[in-house]
Regions:
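Conserved ABC ATPase signature
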Residues: 132-136, 140
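Conserved ABC transporter NBD signature motif
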Residues: 50-61, 73
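Helix-to-loop junction immediately C-terminal to a conserved catalytic motif
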Residues: 42
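Conserved catalytic motifs of ABC-family nucleotide-binding domains
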Residues: 153
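Conserved ABC ATPase "signature" region
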Residues: 109-127
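Catalytic Walker B motif of ABC-type/P-loop ATPase nucleotide-binding domains
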Residues: 157-160
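ABC ATPase C-loop
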Residues: 149-150
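The feature captures the beta-strand-to-loop junction immediately N-terminal to the Walker
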Residues: 27-29
Length: 272
C-alpha cells in the first residue's frame, strides 16, 4: 500500500532479462520478492521506479495513445497463479477455456480451434468439453485452468507454484507437460517454485532472490553447488545433488543428474 505506513519496498535494484525460448525458474524463501516480481512481469502492478518491458514494449499506465501496443504486449504473457482451479467458474470445460479468447474479440471458429489445441496441450480428452469443471479431479481442474491461459496464445508462460497441492502423479504430469510445451512449442516458461527438485529437473536458468534482491543467476546445477549463495538465500540444494555428493565421496562419479533414475542408470553403467 504505497504512501501509507504499511508500505515497504519488496524489490531493490532488480535488473534481469527473461530470454525468449528459455525455461527460467525463480526461487527464494518466503518474502524474498518472488510474487512481486511475477506480478511485475505480468504487468499486474507497476514498479515505483524503473520499467518492465515485454519484447521491447514498456508496460506502463495505459493511455489512448499506447493502448494497442500495451494490450498486445500484455497478451504475450500468460499468468498461472497458485491453485488456478479456484478461478474456474463456467458451466462446462469448453466455456471456461473459451472465456479468454472470446474476450480477446476472436471469431468463434478461432476460439474453437484454440480450445481444442489447448486441451490437447494439457492432455485433456476432448470428451471433457461438455463436462462441468467441478466434476473433474484436482489435477484435471488444474489442467483445465492452465488450458484457459494457453488458449490466449501467450509467448511467455509464468507460473506460481503450479504443482502445489498435487499428488505425486499429478505433479509428474504437470512438470512433464511444461517440459513438452517448452521443448516442442519453444514456449518461454518462468517457474516460481519452492521445490528445488522441480527446478533442477526442469529449468535451464535459475534466478535466486534474497531480501528483494537478485543474488544469483545461472544454470541451476551451478547455483545449487554454490553453498554461499544458497545460505544467502536461506535455501538448501536439492536432495538429489546432496545424495550425489555423498555417493561421489565414496568413489562413484555421478556427474550431473537431474533425476534419481538418471543417477541410478549412471551408477549401474559404471559397474559394468
Amino acid at each position: 500500500m504505497e504512501n501509507t505506513p504499511l508500505s515497504h519496498t519488496a524489490l531493490h535494484d532488480v535488473s534481469l532479462v527473461i530470454n525468449e525460448g528459455e525455461f527460467t525458474a525463480i526461487a527464494g524463501e518466503t518474502g524474498a520478492g518472488k510474487s512481486t516480481l511475477m506480478q511485475l512481469v505480468g504487468g499486474l502492478i507497476q514498479p515505483t521506479s524503473g520499467i518492465v518491458s515485454v519484447d521491447g514494449v514498456p508496460l506502463g499506465k495505459r493511455t489512448p495513445k499506447n493502448d494497442m501496443k500495451d494490450r498486445s504486449a500484455r497478451f504475450r504473457v500468460g499468468m498461472v497463479f497458485q491453485y488456478p482451479e479456484h478461478q474456474l467458474f463456467e458451466e462446462t470445460v469448453y466455456e471456461d477455456i473459451a472465456f479468454g479468447p472470446r474476450n480477446q474479440g476472436l471469431p468463434e471458429a478461432e476460439v474453437e480451434r484454440r480450445v481444442q489445441e489447448s486441451m490437447e496441450l494439457v492432455h485433456l480428452p476432448q470428451v471433457y468439453r461438455e463436462r462441468s469443471p467441478f466434476a473433474l479431479s484436482g489435477g484435471e481442474r488444474r489442467r483445465t485452468a492452465i488450458a484457459g491461459v494457453l488458449a490466449l496464445a501467450p509467448r511467455y508462460l509464468v507460473l506460481d507454484e503450479p504443482a502445489a497441492g498435487l499428488d505425486p502423479r499429478g505433479r509428474e504430469e504437470l512438470l512433464s507437460m511444461l517440459s513438452t510445451l517448452h521443448r516442442e512449442r519453444s514456449m518461454s516458461i518462468v517457474l516460481v517454485s519452492h521445490s528445488m527438485e522441480d527446478i533442477l529437473r526442469s529449468a535451464e536458468r535459475l534466478i535466486l532472490l534474497a531480501n528483494g534482491r537478485v543474488v544469483g543467476a545461472g544454470a541451476p546445477c551451478d547455483i545449487f553447488r554454490n553453498t554461499e549463495l544458497l545460505e544467502q538465500a536461506s535455501l538448501t540444494a536439492p536432495h538429489l545433488l546432496r545424495l550425489g555428493k555423498q555417493i561421489e565421496e565414496i568413489g562413484f562419479p555421478v556427474g550431473h543428474c537431474n533425476t534419481v533414475q538418471e543417477m541410478a542408470d549412471l551408477i549401474l553403467r559404471t559397474q559394468r
